[in-house]
Design a protein with these regions (language model features):
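ALDH superfamily catalytic-core signature
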Residues: 1-149, 171-173, 178-182, 216, ...
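C-terminal core of ALDH-fold dehydrogenases
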Residues: 4, 130-144, 173-261
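Short loop/turn motifs at secondary-structure junctions
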Residues: 18, 61, 158, 186-187, ...
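Short, solvent-exposed loop/beta-turn-alpha elements that line the ligand-binding surface or hinge
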Residues: 154
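Short, surface-exposed loop/turn microsegments at beta-strand edges and helix-strand junctions
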Residues: 157-158, 229
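Glycine-rich nucleotide-phosphate-binding loops and adjacent flexible coil segments
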Residues: 161
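Active-site donor-binding acidic/aromatic loop of nucleotide-activated sugar
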Residues: 164-166
Length: 275
C-alpha cells in the first residue's frame, strides 16, 4: 500500500508546486540473532516476550530468530517451560499473557501459514500450532524450526504469534549476520544477543542497515513513546523516527533568513586591488 501511495504521488508531481513529502512506517520482519556467547535466560525471555506479547500483532514483534547450535537445546527448553505457563483468554484479566488475534481475517491468514508449514519438509513445530475460532480467534504461541533460512515464514510478515527459528552452526557468526541482513525486505527492528564485545561490534557493522531500531541484549519491541524514537527503512518505511525532531522536520519546510546590517557599497572585493 505504501509503495502504491508513493507511486501515485510521484506520478502526479506536475500537480504540485513543490516536491511533496511522504512519511510512512509500514511493517517489519523483525529478528533476534544470538551469538554463541549469549545469555541463555535473557535470550529465551526476550524471544517469548518479543514474539508473543499482544499475540505478535505489533509491527516490531520478533518473528524470526537465528540461534547458534550450542545454545538452542537450552533456549528451547526454557522457552517451552515458559510457554507451558502462559495463559490465553480475556485481555481484561491481567493473569492472561495473551488474547485473541484481532479478527477472522487475521485468524485465517495466520492459520494459513501454519497449515502450509505442516506440509513442508524441513519445518518442525516445536510448540503450539493449534487454532481455535469457536469463541474468539485464538492461536497458540507457536515456534517453528526451519532448516531453510529462506523459508517463507522467515521472510514474510505474519503479524501473529508465530516465531520461526533457524539454528545455525555456532562458528558461522558473520555469515549468519549477512543472512539476517539479506533475508527480508524489511528493516524495522532487530536484536542482537551477545556477551562477547567483539561479536557485538561485528553485528553492529554488518547489520548497520538491517533495523531502524536496533537492540543489544534486549527484545526488539517495546519502544516507549516519547523516549525511544521509532521507525525503520527499506520496505519498513521512510525511517523518519516518530517521536523525535527528525519526524517533525519532515512536516515543515525550513527557511534560512539572512539580514545584512552593513551592506557593501563597491562591487570590487578587497582582493581585486591587491598587488
Amino acid at each position: 500500500m505504501f509503495r502504491s501511495l508513493w507511486h501515485t504521488i510521484g506520478s502526479s508531481l506536475d500537480r504540485y508546486r513543490t516536491y511533496p513529502r511522504i512519511v510512512g512506517e509500514t511493517g517489519g520482519k523483525d529478528f533476534i540473532v544470538a551469538h554463541r556467547s549469549a545469555d541463555v535466560e535473557a535470550l529465551a525471555v526476550a524471544m517469548v516476550r518479543g514474539a508473543y506479547e499482544y499475540q505478535g500483532q505489533k509491527c516490531s514483534a520478533a518473528s524470526r530468530a537465528y540461534i547458534p547450535s550450542n545454545l538452542w537445546p537450552r533456549v528451547k527448553e526454557r522457552m517451552l517451560a515458559m510457554l507451558a505457563e502462559i495463559k490465553m483468554g480475556d485481555v481484561s484479566d491481567f493473569r492472561n499473557f495473551m488474547g485473541a488475534v484481532i479478527d477472522k481475517k487475521a485468524f485465517d491468514r495466520i492459520k494459513g501459514y501454519l497449515d502450509e508449514a505442516r506440509t513442508k519438509p524441513g519445518v518442525t513445530f516445536v510448540a503450539g500450532g493449534k487454532c481455535d475460532d469457536s469463541k474468539g480467534w485464538f492461536i497458540e504461541p507457536t515456534i517453528l524450526q526451519v532448516e531453510d533460512p529462506k523459508y517463507r515464514t522467515m521472510c514474510e510478515e505474519i503479524f501473529g504469534p508465530v516465531l520461526t527459528v533457524h539454528v545455525y552452526a555456532d562458528t558461522k557468526w558473520e555469515e549468519t549476520l549477512h543472512l539476517v541482513d539479506t533475508t527480508s525486505p524489511y528493516a524495522l527492528t532487530g536484536a542482537v544477543f551477545a556477551q562477547d564485545r567483539s561479536a557485538q561490534e561485528t553485528a553492529n557493522r554488518v547489520l548497520r542497515n538491517a533495523a531502524g531500531n536496533y537492540y543489544i541484549n534486549d527484545k526488539p519491541t517495546g519502544a516507549v513513546v516519547g523516549q525511544q524514537p521509532f521507525g525503520g527503512a527499506r520496505a519498513s518505511g521512510t525511517n523518519d523516527k516518530a517521536g523525535s525532531i527528525l519526524n517533525l522536520i519532515r512536516w515543515v519546510s525550513p527557511r534560512l533568513v539572512k539580514e545584512t546590517m552593513v551592506p557593501p557599497k563597491d562591487y570590487k572585493y578587497p582582493f581585486l586591488g591587491a598587488e
